[in-house]
Amino acid sequence: PPIAENVIAYKTFLLDYIRKYPQDMVIPLFNDTAEFASKFKQEIEQYGCKVEIPDWEVFIKGHDKESLMEICKFLGVPHPRTANPDKMGYEEAINYVGYPCLIKPNLSAGAKGIKIIRNKADFDNYFQDITSHFGKSTIQEFIPQTGKQLKVQIYRAENGQVVASSCYEKCRYYPIDGGTRS
């Protein structure tokens, strides 16, 4: 069953499958399955199947965009200015981030829910709608795509050794307007 439609049915199917057909390892390939595998890692591993994903407490710190930006700020890692209008109020948030900026759901993938806003009217038109569909969201400094956009993937063993890696240039910036609603 599709995970997006019924997490419980997906979990039941996966655990039954692993019980009937033992597997050495599960490697989630998409955001929804990565989130699922991290949340239910201990249950899956009870069947002797290693789950190649961090435990939930570690995973969510990097998966939640607001949390990740807070960690970057704390560590002094360059990152787009990010603020939560629900926590600090619109005026303080926009004074920190500035226009144009993006509304970004904390938990989403594939640019879903991301919308570029250029003024207060845009904010008023989109912020509540996006948070009602996608949950907690932030506003983030818009950084125009002026050069190459590279994607780097690194797979490491538990001891930190790089097992595999890849780097490629994205052919286009998607979506052009900063995001999709669905």
Annotate each PLM feature.
Residues 1-4, 84-85, 126:
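Mobile, glycine- and charge-enriched loop segments
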Residues 34-38, 90, 123, 148-149:
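Short, well-ordered alpha-helical microsegments
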Residues 72, 94-116, 135-146, 165:
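ATP-grasp fold ATP-binding core
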Residues 85, 114-119, 154-157:
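Short beta-strand-to-turn element immediately C-terminal to the catalytic PLP-Schiff-base lysine
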Residues 121, 141-182:
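ATP-dependent carboxylate/phosphate-activation module, predominantly the ATP-grasp catalytic core
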